[in-house]
């Protein structure tokens, strides 16, 4: 079983869903970030509970070389969309999508399936297949 599968099983056993795993460097510190979602929202107690359960797993199978901080959090209101499930869960939200031709499409995600998405932009509906998407994220208008 891979580390990601172990993390996913642990997160799901505690009533949450694994959204994403990322590694990054902030303020000269390595961070292993586990983003989760929960029905009803993610709270601090749930993050702490999952962190406590993941810590022994990560002690055995280190996710990064050297010292790192484990961070368990929600993906936030403005989050990256990387998987089909992310797009499916974001239907009805505002998204910003960049394709490989570096065109940027902003608008409401009105449809998503296993092959493509449809964004309602100010210029009309734009259909994009996943293999044409360079990056995508939800965004919030204040």
Swiss-Prot record:
GO terms for cellular component: cytosol. GO terms for biological process: ribosomal small subunit assembly; translation. InterPro entries: Ribosome_maturation_RimP, RimP_C, RimP_C_sf, RimP_N, RimP_N_sf. It is found in: Cytoplasm. It holds the Pfam family RimP_N. Keywords: Cytoplasm, Ribosome biogenesis. Its main location: cytoplasm. It comes from the Bacteria. PANTHER family: RIBOSOME MATURATION FACTOR RIMP. Belongs to the RimP family. Required for maturation of 30S ribosomal subunits. This is Ribosome maturation factor RimP. The gene is rimP.
